[in-house]
Amino acid sequence: MLTTKKTFQTKFLSTLLILALVSTMILAPTALAAGFGGSSITTAVADSGARNFTPTEAANDTEIQAMTDNRSVLNESDIIYMILTDRFYDADPTNNGTLNQEYRPGQLKYTQGGDWKGITQKLDYIKNLGVTAIWISPPSQNELLSRDGEESGYHGYFTHDYNSADPHFGTKQDLIDLVSAAHSKGLKVILDVVPNHTADYFNGASSTYSSASYQPAAPFNNPDWYHHYGDITDWNNEYQVLNYDLGGLDDLNQDNADARQAIKDAYKNWITLTGADGIRVDAARSMPKNFLQEFESYVGVPSFGEIFVGDVDYVSAFSNYEWGVLDFPLFFQAREVFAHDASFTTVKAIFDQDYKYANVNHLITFIDNHDRDRF
């Protein structure tokens, strides 16, 4: 099922490239104002003969096709700079939020002020790193605070309103301007998307809200659009993985036709509005594979999914349903080799299973991200 395949040597060199780039960033200042915080680098290396994704493969929608002149095509040669928007650069203090509520400078579980204007101002810096694309935090409006008040949705994964921009990042026009400015400098833009869950609004496994005034924005305030089984407690139980809540976050039911359509429409609208070039799908493991395939096709840009598992057989199964996947199996083994003196044969064992992927050139390799401690 594989027509092109990275050699062990090529993929190993790409890993060394990531190590060099990330090491440079770790040595750089981490102050938010300096524009270095909240970011890391991933890469996908090109192989001759590899298939490039084109918009016509995903959708024939006239509106999306009309935008192709302004959109670059995400491909295997891209080096991606990941930005946690809130932690990057604060160019507009007026959108930081309420002091001592969601905005608490220096307290890392709360908003710190980074915004889309901040990324736009630092595009020359990013371009000079030698990267070709940026992957930014989810754009949708997040819940200000978790139910217990112990953290904010600074990261973008506590979705409140799928169809509105998070005011802490800026306006929709600010995001449009960011994508346009990035394109003018030859940089592609990847939006993180969260179709699996909203913030935590329901009482455990109940279909009742914890408060009548604390619920997601319409139309996602319909309890019938959700599973109500409580939290995942057994990650080896696939039924739980697909239908239970991830860390308390309310699990959307993609098998509900109305919910499914609303999710697809929300993100297609973001892509159409901004002209972004691709999407990274959060918690892809926790959604039906047929939904992931349909979602990518409908939105109309290539997607790569987060399957937070080190097993090649498990992760590679998703490669038939999305343009690409994050290479978590390599991530786990590379860290063991370079940080804990494990044998290089463990990395080779990962490379030897490349044939299991639909297109090994669409693996997004990395050793550092926003879900893990710095390498």
Regions found by a protein language model. Name each.
Residues 1-9:
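N-terminal secretory signal peptides that target proteins for export/translocation
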Residues 8, 12-13, 25:
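Subset of Sec-pathway N-terminal targeting signals
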Residues 12-20:
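Sec-dependent signal peptide hydrophobic core
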Residues 17, 63-68, 118-122, 348-352:
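Short alpha-helical segments and helix-capping/turn motifs at coil-helix boundaries
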Residues 23-46:
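Sec-dependent signal peptide cleavage junction
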Residues 41-63, 179, 197, 265-367, ...:
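Active-site-proximal helices and loops of the catalytic beta/alpha 8
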Residues 66, 72-79, 86-274, 289-314, ...:
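Substrate-binding/active-site clefts of carbohydrate-active enzymes
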Residues 91-107, 111, 348, 357-375:
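Loop/helix patches that line or flank the sugar-binding groove of alpha-linked glycan CAZymes
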